[in-house]
C-alpha cells in the first residue's frame, strides 16, 4: 500500500500545481449501509467548473491494469471489476451526497496518468452498487457459515503451441488470491513457489 499512498500524494501535488480545484483530500467518510455504519476515507473531491464537485478515487496500477482495464473505460470496468472499484467509488460518493467522478489512474511503472470518467447518468449504477454493498455487509454481519466458498477454484490450464492443456490442478479464483481471508475459505490450499 505504500506505493499507492505515494502515488496519491504525487497526484494531489500535480493537481494543485495545475490549479485544479480540490477539496476533502483523504477525508474520512461514513455511510449507514446494510444496517451498519461503514467508515472509510475517500481520496479526493474535484471541483470542476462544468460538472461541479464529484468524488474521485486515485489508483496506482500495473502497466497491464492501466492499459487493459482502466484504459477501456468505465463500461469495461463494469464487465470485470474483481476488486470492487465501482462499489467503492459509489459508496464514497454516496457518503458525501455527490456523484462519483471516476478514477485518476497512474501507471506505477511509467508515471502516465489517465482520468477514467464515470458517466453523468449514474443513478442506476449507484443503486446497483449500493445494493451489492448492503448485501455484502449484511452477509458479513450475520452468523452465516459457508457451505462452500462464494468463489470456486478454476482449472489450471497451460497453452502450449496454441493448444490448451489442463493440468488437473485447481487454482484459486483471481479475486481470492488477493483476499486476506483466503486461508479461512481454503484451509487445505497449498501455495507452490
Model segments located where?
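Hydrophobic, Leu/Ile/Phe/Ala-enriched alpha-helical segments that form helix-helix packing faces
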Residues: 11-15, 19, 93-96, 137-140
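A generic fold-level signal
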Residues: 37-39, 84, 171
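Residue-level recognition of conserved beta-strand positions in structured domain cores
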Residues: 58-60, 105
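Short, charged, amphipathic alpha-helix that recurs within catalytic cores of restriction-modification
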Residues: 73-95
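Non-catalytic, well-ordered alpha-helical scaffold segments
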Residues: 9, 87-90, 173-174
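Metal-dependent nuclease catalytic cores that hydrolyze phosphodiester bonds in DNA/RNA
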Residues: 1-55, 62-69, 175
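Metal-dependent nuclease catalytic regions and adjoining charged, substrate-binding loops involved
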Residues: 68, 79-81, 95-193
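A residue-level signal for conserved active-site and pocket-lining positions in enzyme catalytic cores
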Residues: 8, 92, 179
Amino acid at each position: 500500500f505504500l506505493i499507492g499512498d505515494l502515488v496519491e500524494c504525487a497526484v494531489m501535488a500535480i493537481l494543485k500545481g495545475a490549479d485544479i480545484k480540490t477539496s476533502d483530500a483523504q477525508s474520512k467518510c461514513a455511510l449507514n449501509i446494510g444496517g451498519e455504519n461503514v467508515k472509510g476515507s475517500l481520496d479526493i473531491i474535484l471541483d470542476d467548473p462544468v460538472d461541479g464537485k464529484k468524488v474521485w478515487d486515485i489508483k496506482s496500477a500495473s502497466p497491464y491494469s492501466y492499459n487493459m482495464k482502466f484504459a477501456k473505460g468505465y463500461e469495461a470496468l463494469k464487465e470485470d471489476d474483481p476488486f470492487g472499484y465501482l462499489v467503492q467509488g459509489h459508496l464514497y460518493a454516496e457518503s458525501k451526497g455527490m456523484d462519483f467522478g471516476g478514477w485518476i489512474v497512474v501507471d506505477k511503472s511509467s508515471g502516465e496518468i489517465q482520468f477514467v470518467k464515470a458517466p453523468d447518468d449514474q443513478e442506476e449504477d449507484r443503486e446497483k452498487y449500493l445494493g451489492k454493498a448492503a448485501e455484502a455487509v449484511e452477509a458479513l454481519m450475520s452468523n452465516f457459515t459457508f457451505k462452500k466458498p462464494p468463489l470456486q477454484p478454476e482449472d489450471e490450464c497451460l497453452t502450449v503451441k496454441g493448444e490448451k492443456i489442463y493440468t488437473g490442478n485447481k487454482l484459486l479464483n483471481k479475486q481470492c488470491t488477493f483476499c486476506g481471508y483466503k486461508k479461512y475459505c481454503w484451509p487445505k490450499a497449498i501455495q507452490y513457489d
